[in-house]
Amino acid sequence: MARITLRQLLDHAAERSYGVPAFNINNMEQGLAIMEAARACDAPVILQVSRGARSYANDIMLAKMMEALEVMYPDIPLCIHQDHGNNVATCLTAIQHGFTSVMMDGSLKEDAKTPADYAYNAMITTEVSRLAHMVGASVEGELGCLGSLETGHGEAEDGHGFEGALDRSQLLTDPDEAARFVAETGVDALAVAIGTSHGAYKFTRKPTGEVLAMDVIEKIHERLPDTHIVMHGSSSVPQEWQDVFNAHGGEMRETYGVPVEEIVRGIRFGVRKVNIDTDLRLAAAAAFRRVADTSRTEFDPRKFLKPAMDAMSAVCKARFEAFGTAGNASRIKVVPMAEMARRYASGSLKPQAKRAEAA
């Protein structure tokens, strides 16, 4: 098997009505944990890398690690995705280092803190789409800002997130504007704002439609039935791992994530990519704390890392099964990026929108 573009993978997911978890990765242990789970489930994989992860691990290290994972797990279609690119250069250097997909997040300006207007977002996302598609790479765009409908605030992730408070209209993607944005930019996938946020502290109570606007996804899918929708900030923050974390010296306050059943509902309405980072961080940190608390003389890093890897793998397996990803790796025949570039050039991959009905 080879590296796969996001577009081909999500096209396959749409044809077979499943979703694909996109796990953030910073190091070898995360990579191995995710890929072991994928092998066990026969699931295709999206490994995504933030700008913070690229700074932490270095592009050369990450590129070589991805090469190693590709060789070690030859039967798993592997999409390597830039998460929350803040400018054209971030996206193009990712492609230069072997990424098959990039996200141009033009919902914020280049400082990754200031909300951008529609014109800026459409302009810069269109430019990234034009350049990436020339070499066959996929592009994800974002419309609307990721943040809490309870508070109006967003949670910065690796330095990416708006400052201050926004009103509800800025925190929810408008379906008509989404149709216009996809048509203008030519993106392969669209991240939408529905009240989710980065980090562990997403909701102060089990979310309802008041703070988790799944109906927005349904309306966008109605306008854009062939567009792949992306849910960001979609960790479920499992209670069992919160309990382990706190039982062994942690001080995590009560919080609620995005329920898995709501994500599964979203998959029925066009959600194809589901971003997950906090769940793996929490599982790994909880496993670390348990070893540190119960084996206080232990100092071999491997004795901490192996349980952390097992914990992360368990979360990944659960998501592959719940989202219907399991069983699909062996059904995919990877299309090379050069062929994807030819298809983009021919216009055969141009997005289509359903016209809005007159009032």
Curated annotation (Swiss-Prot):
Binding site residues for dihydroxyacetone phosphate: G199, G233, S234, S235, N275, I276, D277, T278
Domain of life of the source: Bacteria
A Gene Ontology BP annotation from the UniProt entry: reductive pentose-phosphate cycle
Catalyzed reactions per annotation: beta-D-fructose 1,6-bisphosphate = D-glyceraldehyde 3-phosphate + dihydroxyacetone phosphate
GO molecular function: fructose-bisphosphate aldolase activity; zinc ion binding
Record-linked InterPro entries: Aldolase_TIM (IPR013785), Class_II_FBP_aldolase (IPR050246), FBA_II (IPR000771), Fruct_bisP_Calv (IPR006412)
Entry binding sites for Zn(2+) 2: D105, E142
Keywords of this entry: Calvin cycle, Glycolysis, Lyase, Metal-binding, Plasmid, Zinc
Catalytic center residues: D83
Positions that bind Zn(2+) 1: H84, H198, H232
Binding-site positions, D-glyceraldehyde 3-phosphate: S50
SUPFAM superfamilies documented for this protein: Aldolase
Required co-factors: Zn(2+)
EC number: 4.1.2.13
Pathway info: Carbohydrate biosynthesis; Calvin cycle; Carbohydrate degradation; glycolysis; D-glyceraldehyde 3-phosphate and glycerone phosphate from D-glucose: step 4/4
Subunit structure as annotated in this protein's UniProt entry: Homodimer.
NCBIfam families for the chain: cbbA, FruBisAldo_II_B
Protein function: Catalyzes the aldol condensation of dihydroxyacetone phosphate (DHAP or glycerone-phosphate) with glyceraldehyde 3-phosphate (G3P) to form fructose 1,6-bisphosphate (FBP) in gluconeogenesis and the reverse reaction in glycolysis.
Family membership: Belongs to the class II fructose-bisphosphate aldolase family.
Record-given protein name: Fructose-bisphosphate aldolase
